[in-house]
Amino acid sequence: MSEESFLPEEFQQIVHRFERMMRENQSYYFDREELEDLIFYYSDQFLFSQALSVVEHAKNLFQEHSSILLREAEIYTSMGQLHKSIGLLKKISPLQEHHLDWLMANAVAYSQLHEHDKAIGFLEQAMEISEPENVDDIALEL
């Protein structure tokens, strides 16, 4: 059974629409949330080149929206391109310094670079701003 068969019908249509757009070398409009969902969908399947294609399309539609750049940084971290990831995270830092996903993305990237003190610093900041029910999950990363 394919991964797609477990997706809600509406999201399957979004995936098919995006893939048709890419195949036909067209440009369709997707809202930012749809694009972020597509990025997660492809990243979760380790289809990083497709996820980066979604990122590029999103950047064309929404310039350099910080949430899109954050997702791009997460993809580069997953691909092991850590310096590229950190460069993007630094670029959006003034907009995201108190954003949990941004803090966690930094923690993961710096941890993979074996810069553990920096990683721990980001995790501690994440714990400070996190909802109480999420603190234990973040503490496990320490």
Task: Label every PLM stretch briefly.
Residues E33, S67, D101, N134-E141:
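Start-of-helix register in tetratricopeptide repeats
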Residues Q63, E97, E131-E133:
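Short coil turns that delineate tetratricopeptide repeat
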Residues D37-L38, E72, N106, L142:
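Structural register within alpha-helical repeat arrays
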